């Protein structure tokens, strides 16, 4: 099993891991499975910062890779296959960032770590929360 983190989960991991359920914290610990984040998460964070909805101590271009390195998170690229697959998903979730995460998790057989109640409705997707 490999995990893929939703953007909010990454932020809680960075700021206050106690906001994460115990079963999630256990999986994100040193004895847990490999943990990944999508490159699309950096874009989502940058947009939130630019719109004033999020403050980070460093520019996203520095903060995101440093956080990933510190927490041993693997950054996954968004390729054409994932981008196209995200457009072919059922219209359960309209957020394009979440659709990219769902498509990534489905294509790579990963567990998506998310509190979003709509995301588990995608057939074949495994989630953790």
Predicted stretch roles:
Residues 39-44, 78:
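Short, conserved active-site loops that position catalytic residues or coordinate cofactors/metal ions
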Residues 1-37, 51-66, 70, 108, ...:
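Short, well-structured N-terminal submotif of metal-dependent ribonuclease cores
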Residues 75-76, 127-129:
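Short acidic-hydrophobic, aromatic-tinged amphipathic segments that line or gate anion-handling sites
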Residues 9, 41-42, 82, 101, ...:
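Alpha-helix capping/helix-boundary segments
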Residues 55-61, 65-115:
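Active-site neighborhoods of divalent-metal-dependent phosphate/nucleic-acid chemistry enzymes
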Residues 6-8, 45, 86, 105:
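Generic structural signal for small/hydrophobic residues in well-ordered secondary structure
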Residues 87, 123-124:
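Phosphate-binding/catalytic loops
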């Amino acid at each position: 099993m490999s995990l893929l983190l939703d953007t909010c989960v990454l932020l809680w991991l960075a700021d206050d891991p106690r906001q994460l359920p115990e079963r999630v914290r256990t999986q994100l610990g040193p004895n847990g499975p490999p943990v990944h984040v999508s490159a699309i998460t950096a874009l989502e964070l940058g947009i939130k910062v630019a719109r004033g909805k999020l403050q980070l101590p460093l520019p996203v271009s520095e903060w995101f890779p440093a956080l990933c390195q510190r927490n041993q998170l693997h950054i996954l690229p968004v390729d054409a296959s994932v981008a196209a697959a995200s457009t072919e998903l059922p219209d359960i979730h309209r957020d394009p960032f979440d659709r990219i995460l769902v498509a990534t998790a489905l294509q790579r057989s990963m567990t998506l770590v998310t509190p979003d109640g709509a995301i588990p409705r995608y057939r074949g997707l495994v989630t953790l929360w």
